């Protein structure tokens, strides 16, 4: 299954470690994982809106979304969650 990881990035300490740990766990279970924390630094010149468009594009190609603890505090993660609900993605939570 293709899984998109969603959670807070902006203003969150150690977000890379949190995303990467979940990626490793999901991959051990045989899933193909899209980790948006990996492209946060690769696309530094994008606006927030452009960054979200990229994330939603990748989420659109996934079967499921994995919501990290505390995702409710993130505007971006809330948008991704809403998109996942609207498009009938499987929703997994930490």
Task: Label each residue range with its predicted role.
Residues 1-94:
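Conserved catalytic or regulatory cores that recognize and/or transform ribose-phosphate-containing ligands
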């Amino acid at each position: 299954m293709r899984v998109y990881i969603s959670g807070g990035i902006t203003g969150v300490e150690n977000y890379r470690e949190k995303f990467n740990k979940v990626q490793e766990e999901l991959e051990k279970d045989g899933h193909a994982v899209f980790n948006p924390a990996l492209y946060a630094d690769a696309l530094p010149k994008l606006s927030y809106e452009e960054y979200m468009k990229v994330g939603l594009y990748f989420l659109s190609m996934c079967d499921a979304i994995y919501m990290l603890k505390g995702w409710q505090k993130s505007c971006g993660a809330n948008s991704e969650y809403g998109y996942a609900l609207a498009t009938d993605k499987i929703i997994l939570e930490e």
